């Protein structure tokens, strides 16, 4: 029977040997070895990394998803199971996620005959790149699935806290880049050039008017500039300028509108400053939108196993590519407290392993509800 010590051991193994997105070959094999040792069958999918497993039988099918990739971060936590791979770390807690889903799979395998349907386990690669879920969704991984359930650990929540809401629970994440091509000149003779920095300054100001003047007060979004660059000396007007940043939004129509307004602004500034502006807009994970009925079941299951359920008033503005699995299937996603002093993606991120105690119980309770 799977014990808490087993789950901790699995988590520490994954933590010690992390692998980056798209290169989770050994991680995939370790997962497969554990599942095979419990006689859990695998489903063939056309992906190089990641895997799908299933237990039970019948028409009903619930999918449980975990991400499996790590981040390009040098760990700064000294412990017996510190990452052995330089500049690679499970700084987002996917080791916690994998161990938890393995615990659910192995525990349910022991009571497989009691299941009124099938449970499919999705070990998904490349979450940190923002598209692993979409790639998996295009395979046979979701065939016959009625609902998809998942979670993410959350450092600012205490152990035993469970945060959820129906509707959007995370934001869509987009990246934008503007490449501004002007004409350089001597700083004393600006009339001989087309200054890209003037356009850059106007662009930065104009982008913020999208939020304050183009969106309804009832449609929230964030536009943040992360990088600005132009030139490399004090007395020369550069030929080019560059700016990039991110957009966070919660509705597809708002997401599309912001992108269109950025194109409109770029065209206007081209005419105003007689320069060229290239916009590269990349949509990464969409917003995770929780199904209303599934959210009710999730809350009930969480309370039943002893979680303190927090009803979120607003979504988190972080990205989560679980949304890529929900384009044609209902699902529910929750945040469970991991009580780390340092946040996700920090080199000193160190979740409290007590988080592993209740997660399997919550998912098993929810699965039985959904298969009833």
Residue spans for each PLM region:
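Acidic/His- and Gly-rich active-site-bordering loop/insert found
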Residues: 1-90, 95, 99-102, 106-115
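Non-cysteine beta-strand/loop elements that form the S-adenosyl-L-methionine
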Residues: 63-65, 74, 176, 333-338
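Histidine/acidic-residue-rich, glycine-tolerant segments that coordinate divalent metal ions
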Residues: 71-73, 79-89, 96, 113-238, ...
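Divalent metal-coordination and catalytic microenvironments
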Residues: 14, 53, 64, 94, ...
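Histidine-centered active-site/metal-ligand motif
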Residues: 15-17, 90, 94-97, 152, ...
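Short amphipathic alpha-helical face segments that pack within enzyme cores
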Residues: 99-107, 198-202, 358-365
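Metal-dependent amide/peptide-bond hydrolase catalytic core
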Residues: 204-372
């Amino acid at each position: 029977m799977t014990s808490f010590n087993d789950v901790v051991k699995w988590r520490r193994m994954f933590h010690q040997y992390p692998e980056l997105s798209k290169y989770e070959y050994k991680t995939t094999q370790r997962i497969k070895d554990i599942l095979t040792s419990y006689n859990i069958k695998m489903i063939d999918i056309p992906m190089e990394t990641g895997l799908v497993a299933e237990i039970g039988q019948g028409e009903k099918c619930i999918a449980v998803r975990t991400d499996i990739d790590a981040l390009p971060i040098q760990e700064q936590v000294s412990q017996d199971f510190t990452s052995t791979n330089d500049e690679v770390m499970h700084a987002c807690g996917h080791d916690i996620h994998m161990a938890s889903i393995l615990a659910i799979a192995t525990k349910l395998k022991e009571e497989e005959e009691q299941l009124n349907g099938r449970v499919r386990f999705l070990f998904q690669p490349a979450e940190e790149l923002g598209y692993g879920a979409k790639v998996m969704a295009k395979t046979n991984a979701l065939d016959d699935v009625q609902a998809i359930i998942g979670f993410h650990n959350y450092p600012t929540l205490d152990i035993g806290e469970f945060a959820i809401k129906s509707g959007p629970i995370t934001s869509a994440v987009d990246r934008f880049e503007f490449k501004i091509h002007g004409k350089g000149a001597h700083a004393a003779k600006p009339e001989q050039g087309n200054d890209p920095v003037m356009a850059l300054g106007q662009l930065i100001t104009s982008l913020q008017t999208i939020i304050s003047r183009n969106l309804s007060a009832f449609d929230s979004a964030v536009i943040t500039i992360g990088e600005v660059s132009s030139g490399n000396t004090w007395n020369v007007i550069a030929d080019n300028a560059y700016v990039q940043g991110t957009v966070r939004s919660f509705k597809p129509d708002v997401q599309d509108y912001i992108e269109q307004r950025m194109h409109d602004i770029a065209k206007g500034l081209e005419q105003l400053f007689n320069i060229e502006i290239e916009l590269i807009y990349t949509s990464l994970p969409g917003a995770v939108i929780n199904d209303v009925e599934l959210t009710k079941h999730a809350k009930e299951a969480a309370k039943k196993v002893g979680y303190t359920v927090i009803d979120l008033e607003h979504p988190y503005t972080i990205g989560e590519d679980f949304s890529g699995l929900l384009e044609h299937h209902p699902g529910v996603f929750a945040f469970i407290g991991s009580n780390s002093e340092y946040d996700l993606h920090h080199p000193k991120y160190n979740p409290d392993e007590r988080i592993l105690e209740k997660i399997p119980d919550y998912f098993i309770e929810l699965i039985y509800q959904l298969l009833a």
